[in-house]
Structure formats: C-alpha cells, structure tokens
C-alpha cells in the first residue's frame, strides 16, 4: 500500500534564516508522520582557486597547509550547520532516527551538487529556501533556487518562503499529461494525512483578449461553446485525478475541484486563489500544456513562482 512507503526529503541548508523557514515548514507538516524521513545536506565551499595553484610568493608547504586548514574549516562549518538543523527538527517533534545529516564538499556549483545528491539518494523531493542559499544569493531569487527549478532533473523542488504554514494544498494544473505527475507527487507525499485539504484548480482562459475587434463578432459566438467543451474536458480530467488521490486513502471531503472560466490572466488567477484561499502550499508543473522541452520552466509557472510570496511552492517535473 502506498501509505506505508517512506517519504524521504533532501533539505538543503546553509544555516540562514531562509533555511530555518524550510525546517519550520517541514517540522510543522511532517514531524508527526511515522513514514517521513529527512536528510539535511550542507555544501562546504571549496578552497579559493588561487590557492590551488602554485604561487611563487608562497612556499609550497605553507600553501598546502593553508589549503588543508581552509578545507577543514569549511567542512566543519557545513557539519555544524547540519547538526544544528537536526537539533531543530528533533526539538520540533522529529524522532532522531528519522533525521539524517550530510556535509559535502562543493564539486561543481551548489545547485548541481544538490541535484546530484538528490538523484543518487533517490529522494522524493529537494526542499530549499525560496531566496536561495545565502552564499549564492542573487537579486531576484537565490541563484541556487533558480537553478534547481530550471534544471531538467526529474526530482521535484520545494521552494519554501514565509510564515504561512498549514495543511491546505492548491494543485494548479492544466489538462496536460505531465500534470498527472503533480497529482502523483502530492498524493504520494500526503497519503494517509487526514488533515490535508486538497483543491484541484484549473483555469480556462478566455479567447477575447486575443481577438481583433472585427474577429470578435465571429469567434465570440463560439467562445461559449468552446469553453463549455473545455470545462467538460477539465471535469473528466479531475475525475481521473481524484481517483489517483483516492489511492492515498483521502476521504471525499478532503479533495475538491475548482474550475475558473473566462480568465484573462491564468497566473494571476492562481496567485489570487492561493492568497484568497490561504493555501500554505501551491503545487504546479515546470511546464504546462504544449510546453516545449527546451523551455524548462513554463510561462505560467514562472509568473506564479515569481509573483506568489509567503508560501511554499512545489515544482514538479
């Protein structure tokens, strides 16, 4: 039975306030779950490249001694970070046996090292602070977070931000086959959680904003018919989605379907629904219906990720 399988999340931490929000989110939602494990990883930065090269101004013995001292210091800092993070999770309800730690030395860049560990460890998701790891922070969003969601990895990425933590989950999906991966992921992670409230949300856009004035007279006449067929297709899709979620032993009143028609801005409608409904977590796919593989992050997903603050966003490949 799916509910008996263990869920294992890789939490990337650098000891920053953003990283602590990730720990708070994980502990609030999953500490009481006996089928949930966490591995905390911290990436120790490498020795500066100029010290890796022969330097005529620096004696070789002294150079290597300095390299070893810096490596040891960086690794110890990474170890201290994961130890403190584990102490936080344990103090907030996680049994020590379900919290593991790893301190790793940076080999490529931080995002690639995290994804490599995620693939090798076969984790169910990677959780990271929305604004990224402090050492790699960027002006718009932490570059580590951005690289993680832009990667072609199949590992879902959880971007954690803000203080809104509750058991309300908004699954923003269109009718593409890849969207079933979003439902599968959420259903697997939350299976058996009697407190979870799940809303399957689909937005059907209006044709009118894209019509020229002289075309609206003709195409506007069929818009109602097209939207009706789209709505019927959406309801059939969500009936199938509900069957998938039903395998997680959710009760009928835990899962609802919400369809919005006539939208002029799909991303804005998803953001508004998340805020108005006070959802603590929004789950969506990297690419939407008709998305090209070359476009790793779809337009709607990008707008939601950048526009929705103070929530957790699960980005599923």
Predicted regions and their residues:
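Gly/Ser-rich helix-loop-strand patches that form or flank binding pockets
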Residues: 4-5, 25, 31-32, 112-165, ...
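Short, structured motif recognition centered on aromatic/hydrophobic residues
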Residues: 11, 38-40, 89, 123-126, ...
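A structural micro-motif
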Residues: 36, 97, 155, 196, ...
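A short acidic, glycine-rich active-site loop
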Residues: 63-80, 220-236
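Fold-core signature of tandem repeat domains
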Residues: 81-82, 114, 183, 237-238
């Amino acid at each position: 039975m799916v509910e008996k399988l263990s869920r294992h999340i890789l939490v990337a931490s650098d000891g920053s306030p953003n990283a602590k929000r990730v720990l708070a989110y994980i502990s609030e939602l999953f500490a009481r779950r006996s089928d949930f494990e966490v591995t905390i990883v911290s990436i120790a930065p490498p020795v500066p490249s100029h010290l890796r090269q022969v330097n005529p101004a620096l004696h070789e013995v002294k150079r290597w001694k300095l390299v070893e001292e810096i490596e040891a210091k960086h690794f110890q800092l990474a170890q201290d970070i994961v130890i403190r993070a584990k102490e936080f999770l344990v103090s907030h309800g996680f049994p020590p046996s379900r919290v593991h730690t790893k301190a790793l030395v940076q080999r490529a860049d931080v995002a690639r090292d995290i994804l490599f560990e995620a693939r090798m460890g076969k984790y169910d998701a990677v959780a990271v602070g929305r604004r990224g790891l402090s050492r790699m922070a960027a002006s718009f969003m932490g570059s580590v977070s951005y690289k993680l969601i832009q990667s072609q990895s199949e590992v879902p990425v959880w971007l954690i931000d803000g203080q809104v933590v509750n058991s309300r989950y908004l699954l923003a999906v269109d009718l593409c086959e890849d969207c079933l991966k979003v439902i599968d992921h959420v259903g697997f992670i939350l299976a058996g959680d009697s407190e979870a409230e799940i809303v399957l949300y689909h937005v059907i856009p209006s044709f009118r904003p894209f019509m020229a004035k002289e075309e609206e007279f003709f195409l506007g006449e069929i818009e109602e018919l097209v939207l009706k067929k789209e709505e019927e297709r959406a309801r059939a899709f969500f009936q199938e989605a509900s069957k998938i979620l039903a395998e997680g032993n959710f009760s009928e009143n835990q899962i609802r379907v919400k369809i919005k028609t006539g939208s002029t801005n799909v991303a804005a409608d998803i953001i508004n629904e998340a805020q108005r409904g006070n959802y603590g977590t929004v789950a969506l796919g990297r690419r939407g219906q008709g998305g090209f593989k070359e476009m790793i992050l779809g337009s709607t997903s990008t707008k939601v990720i950048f526009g929705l603050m103070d929530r957790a966003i699960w980005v599923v490949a």
